[in-house]
């Protein structure tokens, strides 16, 4: 179940707000300029789908986003617990960073935790299958896939180069809860 927990950005001792209600989550995030929607990830992908399988199954969703915003490229990120690079990738994504473009993800399997540092708050968004999130360009954030990751998401980009991060150097991510 998708969830949103909001903390003050000076520590994670006590949540300021939390909910698993998709409408309430959308309302809170939309107020911050973050798009959050529940889409249908209902295509059969098999146990360990190839990127081509995922892209073919969800081309209709990609086409909608491209038509709406003019995105230029897309790919699939899929991570499983048996991936030998899981620790290195988790460490990389756990560092606060920004992008020069919106970060758009459509989760078609599993879950991951987006943590958005907006103003004086941290918004922890547990995204699961069926969730579409679009984090505005320039928003400091980090992503936790957990120690035993299991997710597949379609990534949509404004530029043909794909994922380009600008790390802030802030240690803020270390102060907030992570996925197990």
From Swiss-Prot:
GO terms for molecular function: acireductone dioxygenase (Ni2+-requiring) activity; acireductone dioxygenase [iron(II)-requiring] activity; iron ion binding; nickel cation binding. Fe(2+) binds at residues 97, 99, 103, 141. It is an enzyme of class 1 (oxidoreductase). Keywords: Amino-acid biosynthesis, Dioxygenase, Iron, Metal-binding, Methionine biosynthesis, Nickel, Oxidoreductase. Monomer. The keyword Nucleus does not apply. The record marks 102 as: May play a role in transmitting local conformational changes. It comes from the Bacteria. It comes from Cronobacter sakazakii (strain ATCC BAA-894). The record marks 96 as: May play a role in metal incorporation in vivo. Ni(2+) binds at residues 97, 99, 103, 141. Its cofactor is Fe(2+); Ni(2+). CDD domains: cupin_ARD (cd02232). This is Acireductone dioxygenase. The record marks 105 as: Important to generate the dianion. It catalyses: 1,2-dihydroxy-5-(methylsulfanyl)pent-1-en-3-one + O2 = 3-(methylsulfanyl)propanoate + CO + formate + 2 H(+); 1,2-dihydroxy-5-(methylsulfanyl)pent-1-en-3-one + O2 = 4-methylsulfanyl-2-oxobutanoate + formate + 2 H(+). GO terms for biological process: L-methionine salvage from methylthioadenosine; L-methionine salvage from S-adenosylmethionine. SUPFAM superfamilies: RmlC-like cupins. InterPro entries: ARD, ARD_bac, RmlC-like_jellyroll, RmlC_Cupin_sf. Binds 1 Fe(2+) cation per monomer. It holds the Pfam family ARD. Catalyzes 2 different reactions between oxygen and the acireductone 1,2-dihydroxy-3-keto-5-methylthiopentene (DHK-MTPene) depending upon the metal bound in the active site. Fe-containing acireductone dioxygenase (Fe-ARD) produces formate and 2-keto-4-methylthiobutyrate (KMTB), the alpha-ketoacid precursor of methionine in the methionine recycle pathway. Ni-containing acireductone dioxygenase (Ni-ARD) produces methylthiopropionate, carbon monoxide and formate, and does not lie on the methionine recycle pathway.
